[in-house]
Swiss-Prot record:
The keyword Kinase applies. Its main location: cytoplasm. It is found in: Cytoplasm. The lineage of its organism: Bacteria, Bacillati, Mycoplasmatota, Mycoplasmoidales, Mycoplasmoidaceae. This is Thymidine kinase.
Length: 223
């Protein structure tokens, strides 16, 4: 007889685990899913095919891993669940590297939750520019529970909230491609102060003026 718990009551919800690179997002997703095994709760993990760092599994930088189903797009998750390959006893759906999906993943997550599934999602909150990555801003709205993790700044040791990209030792330009699959060869975690993106545009006409004004004000105080 199946154990009675929150997952057996057909009440769905969405959990979002997010933060910069090297914050332990995938490790936290794996931890939450792995503990379900002790309560005999069935789960299934999906990941986007574009993430080629590991094949047919999600893997944290601490070495933990879980098998996963690779999909090209968010709607394929629903197709798989409707197929004969799906175990009808599955209560929890895990989704890793969610930033690589488009906005349709939001609808998929909502549909799953509305139909009794617990959906646990992990992914980057910001791209290398410091802007919302893919569907993440909308997922913040839809999620019932949000866990925002931090890493350690490579420059000063403070809490890191941003992912910095460097190519051949130089900061990536704002106009570079958003997606560049890689790890420590391109990326590091940094705090807000040490996050630099050359040629970043400003929406407000007086933003650059304010930045120059404030820098001069600080410089004059130090004289």
């Amino acid at each position: 007889m199946a154990k009675v718990n929150a997952f057996s009551k057909k009440i769905g919800w969405i959990e979002l685990i997010t933060g910069p690179m090297f914050a332990g997002k995938t490790a936290e997703l794996i931890r939450r899913l792995h503990r379900l095994e002790y309560a005999d709760v069935k789960y299934l993990v999906f990941k986007p095919k574009i993430d080629t760092r590991s094949i047919r599994n999600i893997q944290s930088r601490t070495g933990t891993s879980l098998p996963s189903v690779e999909v090209e797009s968010a709607p394929e998750i629903l197709n798989y669940i409707m197929s004969n390959s799906f175990n009808d006893e599955t209560k929890v759906i895990g989704i890793d590297e969610v930033q690589f999906f488009d906005d349709r993943i939001c609808e998929v997550a909502n549909i799953l939750a509305e139909n009794g599934f617990v959906v646990i999602i992990s992914g980057l909150d910001k791209n290398f520019k410091g802007e919302p990555f893919g569907p993440i801003a909308k997922l913040f709205t839809y999620a019932d529970k949000i866990t925002k993790l931090t890493a350690i700044c490579n420059e000063c040791g403070a809490e890191a909230t941003h992912s910095l990209r460097k190519i051949d030792g130089k900061h990536a330009d704002y106009n570079d491609d958003i997606v560049k699959i890689g790890c420590q060869e391109f990326y590091s975690a940094v705090c807000r102060h040490h996050h630099k993106v050359p040629n970043r545009p400003y929406l407000n006409s007086n933003s650059e003026e304010f930045i120059k004004f404030f820098k001069n004000k600080k410089r004059n105080k130090n004289i």
